[in-house]
């Protein structure tokens, strides 16, 4: 009986064939200042969430980056801090920022590919899921 009940619950949570979840959270990239060739740059990654959704504090938001020719990354995997002083539950009230530290060997435009992973919940229906989205960290180096 429990098995049947479990299968029925999973069927209700599944999406119709061909449907996919909306991208709940998006990343915004902004350098802390002008990026100069040969100097370490701090790119601040901030986040915005679709109304009606919340982001879990744990597991942490992670950004896994891939090295590209001409750009040296201080870290290829960065996790956002799970602390949020305003939060009274497991969800963020104020989303954290992540700092990507990178050094480009010469002037030019670069895009550092990566994967942003986070867990979200829909406050209206209680649906929660893990989501991984492709991102590109833009670098305009002088």
What function would you assign to each model-found segment?
Residues 13-142:
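Extracellular/lumen-exposed scaffold segments
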Residues 3-12:
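Sec-dependent N-terminal signal peptides
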